[in-house]
């Protein structure tokens, strides 16, 4: 019975000390489960009875959509985002809203006004961010699957740290209507799951064109493909910036592809040093623009007075480099760099079907450890190129170091999501 499964998850959530959830309404989801059991039209849908957690920057009617910030602490969603409507239409149930870095501006899960999320795979370490609660909820078995958002690695980073699967679809594959945006030219919604097969199913359920999001695209259903004849690219610079212990685990993962019959191709990406400055300069400007609606008049509090330290830092830098006298010096140069980075990245796919490598260059730090902003940003160096270039990228578990999970990142060209998801599935089967 679906209601029994919902009750079991609600009990687990209640007992959990991971701090994965911000808002759970047991009475509401149990009532919806009872109605679902009587709904014969949804019984053959791919997500029928699946219990899904949703990141707290995606609108779900009747739930607190706070972005883990005191700015929106009292805001309750008045509508369902397009992805949530799609989930419900496929027979899924929303169990609650997950914790996250405030306004999705972080890589650790520690900037939430509700306190940090713990990593179920290594309880003394960060789970990664910004989709920290969604990743932790899946890793701790507090739901069947979860939805997160990825602006510069916010699905893939916590998936890697928590030892689960995460997928960032190509830009435009999934509608962002109902998402509280961080940086609109980078943002994408995607799945966090216990296995790669579920990531394929969940991506198919939420993707598709939406009149409410002009960037959204229609794509055919993603199917599993044979990858045995694929060329797998390994980028030297991605490996070089990664800690040796993580690199060793990734090299074992690359051998798995070789054993499957894939050809390994050595590649070089000369713009790796531009990744973080390009990403963050554009991010700051777009985030500053996005937060102007949080003025304390229509809803919530005035953001500059209510937000935390990291969000305020991003707003102030974004304001500064948006000014006319600095825009040409910083923002416009970042846009030029983005164009060069994208051209170079897309060129790599002329030599390889997919690019495989590490997700994050270092192990997650311990909860509460003093880490500088620059050290925090360094977690993103291998994930932001995906968002800068609009390509797709997934993460699957690839070993561990003293019990701390390591994630293998698989990147594909724009709209080659099917290839990436297929490779994730085959890797899991053969690892």
From Swiss-Prot:
Q: List the GO terms this entry assigns under cellular component, sorted alphabetically.
A: glutamyl-tRNA(Gln) amidotransferase complex
Function, as annotated, reads:
Allows the formation of correctly charged Gln-tRNA(Gln) through the transamidation of misacylated Glu-tRNA(Gln) in organisms which lack glutaminyl-tRNA synthetase. The reaction takes place in the presence of glutamine and ATP through an activated gamma-phospho-Glu-tRNA(Gln).
Q: How does it assemble?
A: Heterotrimer of A, B and C subunits.
Which keywords are on file for this protein? ATP-binding, Ligase, Nucleotide-binding, Protein biosynthesis
What is a GO molecular function of this protein?
ATP binding
Whose protein is this, by species? Answer: Methanococcus maripaludis (strain DSM 14266 / JCM 13030 / NBRC 101832 / S2 / LL)
Q: What is this protein called?
A: Glutamyl-tRNA(Gln) amidotransferase subunit A
Enzyme Commission number(s): 6.3.5.7
**A biological process from GO:** translation
Gene3D superfamilies noted in UniProt: Amidase signature (AS) domain
Kindly give the PANTHER family that the UniProt entry links to this protein: GLUTAMYL-TRNA(GLN) AMIDOTRANSFERASE SUBUNIT A, MITOCHONDRIAL, TRANSAMIDASE
NCBIfam families to which the protein is assigned, alphabetical = gatA
